[in-house]
Every structure is written in structure tokens, then in C-alpha cells.
Amino acid sequence: MKDSIDFGSMDISMLFRKLLVPTVLGMVFSAIFVITDGIFVGKGIGSDALAAVNITAPLFMIATGIGLMFGVGGSVVASIYLSQGKRKAANINITQALVFSTFIVLVMSALCFCFVGPLGCLLGSSDRLLPLVIEYMIWYLPFLVFYELLSTGMFFIRLDGSPNYAMMCNAIAAIFNIIFDYIFIFEFGWGMMGAAFATSLGTVVGGLMTVIYLTRFSRNIHLHRIKLSLKSLMLTLRNGGYMIKLGTSAFISEASIACMMFLGNYVFIHHLGEDGVAAFSIACYFFPIIFMVYNAIAQSAQPIISYNFGAGQPDRVRKALHLAIRTALICGISFFIITFLCRQNIVSLFIDRSCPAFDIAVNGIPYFGVGFIFFAANMIGIGYYQSIRRGQRATIITLLRGVVFMLIGFFVLPLVLGVPGIWLAVPLAELLTTLYIIGIYFKDRFMIHRL
């Protein structure tokens, strides 16, 4: 189950490929997880159901983002401890990361479950979509914690040297999701309840697989029993705060997708009604796939960069960074070309050509796809700063990208360009973020030359 990986001495290109291939495949299975839901909901229930799922999606993104935050923070700290031979400290940190993230998501799920009606309205649901939104939330909110466990556990399994097992967690979860989606929606006719329950059960399987690995099969790192003394609890809180600091940008990256969906739902329903939201939901199903691939590239580079940064090997850090940037940009250009050429086929996967939302989506998605190229550079830049413990800088970049520039795009461009401006809001945010990263890069170089 354990793969032969040496972060400190193996050739960087070989090491990166060894991590990248299973990580990308795992993310592809996660993407299948997302796409399957969209296809079954759109074809089996209808475009209104597709719009309703998109309205609830920010909650899923936030839970996953919490998992990513503690996964990044915990794995960066643990990587550096392992490079220094401090295995016990690494074990304590990954355990604290799992405990913290699980507790936060459980509290969030309970609060959301108690207020599903008002929450649906707050997320931007119209009166027509609200019953579908509520039904979906009731059946997936209790299982949100397994989304978090799957997201957090992936980092620690890869850090332990088992990227193939991490891939299998996502793959098996996706397979179960596909099977349950077909049975619950088409065979049993359970509608929104079936779609939510199928996704939840698939995630339960994946989440439990990560926990089983960390408790039974891990080699280098293990879950460590946390003491309940006041001193131990204070230390846990301190370490948790530090992990949050390092991983905040990872959370904001995921939350920015939630922000994009939230703002987009409001703007689209204002300009184009429920059909506009249904069209936008197709882009939102496609966007996380792009995010997952870029995230896989960043996650593959992260343990290499963190380990060698902690070991004082800057040349290996630079090689890993340059390799990640080249890989991401190639993917970004490819995704844009595929989106532009295959937009009708992509949209027809989710809804019938007779739906009013079909033409809206086909006309808008090429505008939306422009941002994929800039998104690639941004994800690697953010991941790099996380990996070298520059969490504050990564957080600033992510906040600008996911909130400030997104708000500017959604509320300014539609006034200037009309409907195309709504679709171009996200690409504008990505472009401005890329320009900001280039700016601080040259500023850093200028400061170094002055010294």
C-alpha cells in the first residue's frame, strides 16, 4: 500500500510525476462525483432541480474548504517536522487537524439543518425553487462531515507516501455515487432526496476509507491520542490556530467557488430568471473540475516544496515550483480550447437541447472559459506561498481573487457589457489576480537586488 517516495533525494521530475498522476486521477474521480450528480439531476429530474442543487452547492464547498484548510495547514507543518526527524510532533499535528476540522463541520451542519428554509432563501433561492432546495439540503447536510474527512485525509495519506490509496478513496466514492444515483433517481424515482442521498453515501465510503488508512495502515505518520489536560488542550488550540493561518488561503480558494456560485446565482436570477441559474449551474459543475486538476497539481508540489524548504534545499524547491507552473499552464490552455470547441456537447450532457437554458449556457460558457488559463497560474502561486509558510501572502492573494475582484466583476461588468459581462466576471477576477501575483513577484526580485 505504501509507495517508495523520498522527498529529500529523489529526482524532482520523477517525484512530481509519482505524486501527480495518482493525485490527478483521484481528482478526476472527484470530478466524476460532481458531474454525475449534474447529469443525473438534469436528465432525471429537470433543469429546476439542477438550479436547486447549484444553490445549495456553497455549503458543500465550505465543508470541503474547511477540510482543505486543515489538510494544507496540518500537512505543511507535519512535512517540516518529518524533514527534521520529529515524527511524534508530526503525528500530533495531523491528529489535531482532523479533530479540529471535524468539530467545526459538525457544528456547521447542525446549525444549517435547524434553519434550512431561511438558509435556502439566503443562498438566493426563488420561491419556485425553494422546496427543491430544502429537500436536497435535508438529505445531505447530516453527511457533510464526510466531505471534510475525505478532503483533509487526502493530504496526510499522500504525505505518508501512499498517493495511490488516496486516489482509490476518491475513485471508490465516485463509483458508489454513480451506482446510487442511477438506482435512487431512475429506478426508485426518489427525486432530489435520491440525488442527495446517493452523493452522501458515496462520500461516507470515501471518508471512512481515509480514517481506516490513518488508523490501521499508515507507516510514517499515525493518529496520536490527544490528552485532555488543560495544558494539552491549550497546545491543541495553539497548533490549530497556526494550521488555520497556514491553510486559510486553501479554505478561501474553495470558499471563493462558493462565493462565485452565490453571487452568480443572484445576478443570473436577476437578469435571466431560473433558466439563467440553470445555465450558470452547468458552468459551476464544470468549474470545480478545473479547480480539482489545478489543485491536484498544487497538492502534488506541496509536500515536495514543504519538505525541501524545511530541509534547506532551495534548488529543489525552485525545480518543483517551475514544473508545477508549466504543467498547470498547459492544462489551462487545453481546458480553454476544449471548452470552446465542445461547448454544445458539454451542455447537452446536463440538459436537453429543447430547454431554454441550453442556448444561454452554450453562448456563455466560452466567455467563462477564458479564465481557466489565469486560474492555473493563480492556483500554483497560492499553493507555493502556502508550502513555504507564507500563509499571510497566500491568504491576501486568495481574498483578492475570491472576494474583492469577484465582486467587482459581477457588479460592474453586467452594467457595461450586459449578459456577456456576467459570464466574464470570473475571468476578470482571475486576470486581476494574475497581474497582482506578477506584481509582487517583480517587487520581491527588486527588493532582493537592492539588498
Spans of features found by a protein language model:
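Small-residue-rich hydrophobic transmembrane alpha-helices
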Residues: L50-A110, Y147-A166, A279-L341, F375-I397
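N-terminal transmembrane alpha-helices
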Residues: F7-I45, P58-G73, Y81, T102-S109, ...
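Helix-terminus/linker motif at the lipid-water interface of multi-pass membrane proteins
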Residues: I32-L50, G120-D127, I183-W190, F251, ...
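Short runs within selected transmembrane alpha-helices of multi-pass transporters and secretion channels
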Residues: G71, Y140-R158, A166-A174, A195-V211, ...
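Transmembrane helical elements of multi-pass membrane transporters/channels
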Residues: K18-D37, W139, L150, A173, ...
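Short alpha-helical transmembrane segments in multi-pass integral membrane proteins
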Residues: M1-T23, A78-F143, G189-G247, I305-G371, ...
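Residue-level hotspots within pore-lining transmembrane alpha-helices
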Residues: L25, F29, F33, A63-G67, ...
